[in-house]
Amino acid sequence: MRSDMIKKGDHQAPARSLLHATGALKNPTDMNKPFVAICNSYIDIVPGHVHLRELADIAKEAIREAGAIPFEFNTIGVDDGIAMGHIGMRYSLPSREIIADAAETVINAHWFDGVFYIPNCDKITPGMLLAAVRTNVPAIFCSGGPMKAGLSAQGKALTLSSMFEAVGAFKEGKLSKEAFLDMEQNACPTCGSCAGMFTANSMNCLMEVLGLALPYNGTALAVSEQRREMIREAAFKLVDNIKKDIKPLDIVTREAIDDAFALDMAMGGSTNTVLHTLAIANEAGIDYDLERINEIAKKTPYLSKIAPSSSYSMHDVHEAGGCPAIINELMKKEGTLHPDRLTVTGKTLRENNEGKEIKNFDVIHSLDDPYDKQGGLSILFGNIAPKGAVIKVGGVDPSIKIFTGKAICFNSHDEAVEAIDNKIVREGHVVVIRYEGPKGGPGMPEMLAPTSSIVGRGLGKDVALITDGRFSGATRGIAVGHISPEAASGGPIGLIKDGDEVTIDLINRTLNVNQTKEELNHRKEALQPFKAKVKSGYLARYTALVTSANTGGIMQVPENLI
């Protein structure tokens, strides 16, 4: 066993003394059992994580019943909704790397035989997944689950995205103070990740099709008994996989990454999934071309529109059959998935999901009646984004295939929000927000406030927004993010001027400014070099090492320093 490194031999008597002092070893034979880390992310300012201490206790009990010894440790967590729109958002994406590094440190320092990961919200799941792939120790994921959707006094279903858009509507006088406060009190009624197909739930659904979590991991409610039963089942599976030596890199293959994007397309997941999945591919040593994502989109039908793209919540999806029903439907179209891959259940993806039929065709459409014949995400290329950009086409009004407008440029999120609030941004504008990428932000903050204000003001079909920053999974409208290279790295988004004509073509998947190559080169010669905004602390180190979004926004040590 891997843990023999810290518990076998006379020379490890001091380590054994310390292990006895933990109280985790109940009898002499326990030293001969596998040591399992529970990598938890309990934190009580994050509603998606307030209940994870209880789930960890269930996991501990089940791991012990299965014949192994559990030890729990915690990672940090950032609530993107609370950190939104201020300096706190600079720390959200960078927290992913801290989580990965922290988990790697504990797992390798103590030579655990297996790891039970309990994530839930936005950066925690991908951070833990980076650690799982990096350490390649037998692992299983069981998230905390989504919260219930809220309900307004008028009986309207609510999610957190409803609240962000309500801010714009309230400022426009389209929503009364009473209705505004009612929504605030009722949008988030329980613990769990936010109720729509936002980043947290998108990633937790993808864990199912990647093969590192049990079926229904992405949709079973946080407050449900099924969630607790799933924790127990996952614990027994993990201990069995330790004995069989099934590791993450046996499961996370190029085909698994393909299938993750296919499910993402079918569910219209968050654009952040592209960022995180590319980072996972990089960590797994898989060279993954962005154009491959478009090829997957072309052959994957869009089957389930979930909030913010509709009024349906994750609970509605669960009741309609969950991810297993969507995966089963996709398997009926040959070439869409790779169903004979190994998963953490010890069975194939096909065996996990075959026969799981759709229970409500309003929530999950069939192959014969998709929302669209192509997936809900697209990668755009062009002279603004030579290395790619991402748009959630499932969140764009279906009538819009090509949008051309006049650029109105801002070098920060805050400048753009002020202009939108002051009605400087008008119909026909393409809002350009730059120097908000991984390096420029720093931290690639989410642009939820400006997109929500645009939609809340009723301009969702009349104003577009493009940025080298990113979006919340709650974003909808004509919103293009992850533009690469970013402005801080000399990307052409930094060359756009007010009044330039910008075209977003969803048919041909292009993003261009109507300027000649010569003019753009002339502008580049006059461009001032980017100066880092933060000079000390973690964000200064992050700025120095982070790459653009087309590589997943990973931190990379320059080769000349290795």
Curated annotation (Swiss-Prot):
It comes from the Bacteria. The active site is at S472. Its cofactor is [2Fe-2S] cluster; Mg(2+). It is an enzyme of class 4 (lyase). It holds the Pfam family ILV_EDD_C. The keyword Signal does not apply. Pathway: Amino-acid biosynthesis; L-isoleucine biosynthesis; L-isoleucine from 2-oxobutanoate: step 3/4; Amino-acid biosynthesis; L-valine biosynthesis; L-valine from pyruvate: step 3/4. It catalyses: (2R)-2,3-dihydroxy-3-methylbutanoate = 3-methyl-2-oxobutanoate + H2O; (2R,3R)-2,3-dihydroxy-3-methylpentanoate = (S)-3-methyl-2-oxopentanoate + H2O. GO terms for cellular component: cytosol. Signal peptide: none annotated. The modification N6-carboxylysine is found at K123. Binds 1 [2Fe-2S] cluster per subunit. This cluster acts as a Lewis acid cofactor. InterPro entries: Dihydro-acid_dehy_C (IPR042096), DihydroxyA_deHydtase (IPR004404), DiOHA_6PGluconate_deHydtase_CS (IPR020558), ILV_EDD_C (IPR056740), ILV_EDD_N (IPR000581), IlvD/EDD_N (IPR037237). Mg(2+) binds at D80, D122, K123, E446. GO terms for molecular function: 2 iron, 2 sulfur cluster binding; dihydroxy-acid dehydratase activity; magnesium ion binding. [2Fe-2S] cluster binds at C121, C194. Its EC number is 4.2.1.9. Keywords: 2Fe-2S, Amino-acid biosynthesis, Branched-chain amino acid biosynthesis, Iron, Iron-sulfur, Lyase, Magnesium, Metal-binding. GO terms for biological process: isoleucine biosynthetic process; L-valine biosynthetic process. Functions in the biosynthesis of branched-chain amino acids. Catalyzes the dehydration of (2R,3R)-2,3-dihydroxy-3-methylpentanoate (2,3-dihydroxy-3-methylvalerate) into 2-oxo-3-methylpentanoate (2-oxo-3-methylvalerate) and of (2R)-2,3-dihydroxy-3-methylbutanoate (2,3-dihydroxyisovalerate) into 2-oxo-3-methylbutanoate (2-oxoisovalerate), the penultimate precursor to L-isoleucine and L-valine, respectively. HAMAP family: IlvD (MF_00012). Belongs to the IlvD/Edd family. Homodimer. This is Dihydroxy-acid dehydratase. It comes from Staphylococcus haemolyticus (strain JCSC1435). The gene is ilvD.
